[in-house]
């Protein structure tokens, strides 16, 4: 009911934050996407899902250490998400080990590329942001690519969050200018 009231009040996008997919990746393609479909059923606004890799939880940090040099876990669920009614998929790309080529598995979806690391107070440069977007553009059409943060900025100091958002805007503008100059 809350989602329908929010939509009726003018909300354009409803994003589902999915913290369990990464823990239960083997099962998420079956039950997780069905749960998302059920939650989004009847909504006419844009729907998105953020599959969170998690922050600060010892079990999650330990799990990440076992993933090796490439985090290919998304490969298990992206085909099911691509076939779903969810419109957008949000990915953590800055300083993660998720290979950019996995984005190709989300054909037909808008891909929100996390270009800001929320686990560090170090502010990205516009060049770093533009480079991350350039990598994504090898696998996602320009009209389907959206720049975003890896996750929420709430835990960090306001001035750091502001600087990171400014880097996101400047980096996206830089990437756009480079694309436009090639056209």
What are the language-model segments listed below?
Residues 1-183:
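Domain-level signal for soluble alpha/beta catalytic cores
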């Amino acid at each position: 009911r809350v989602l329908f009231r929010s939509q009726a009040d003018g909300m354009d996008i409803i994003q589902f934050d999915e913290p369990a997919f990464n823990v239960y990746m083997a099962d998420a393609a079956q039950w997780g996407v069905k749960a998302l479909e059920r939650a989004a059923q009847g909504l006419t606004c844009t729907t998105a899902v953020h599959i969170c890799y998690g922050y600060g939880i010892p079990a999650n940090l330990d799990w990440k250490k076992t993933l090796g040099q490439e985090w290919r876990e998304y490969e298990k669920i992206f085909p099911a998400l691509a076939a779903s009614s969810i419109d957008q998929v949000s990915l953590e790309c800055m300083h993660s080990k998720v290979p950019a080529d996995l984005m190709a598995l989300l054909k037909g979806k808008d891909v929100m590329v996390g270009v800001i690391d929320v686990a560090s107070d170090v502010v990205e440069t516009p060049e770093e942001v533009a480079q991350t977007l350039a990598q994504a553009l090898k696998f996602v059409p320009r009209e389907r690519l959206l720049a975003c943060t890896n996750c929420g900025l709430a835990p960090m100091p306001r001035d750091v969050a502001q600087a990171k958002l400014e880097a996101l805007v400047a980096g996206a503008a830089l990437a756009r200018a480079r694309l436009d100059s090639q056209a």
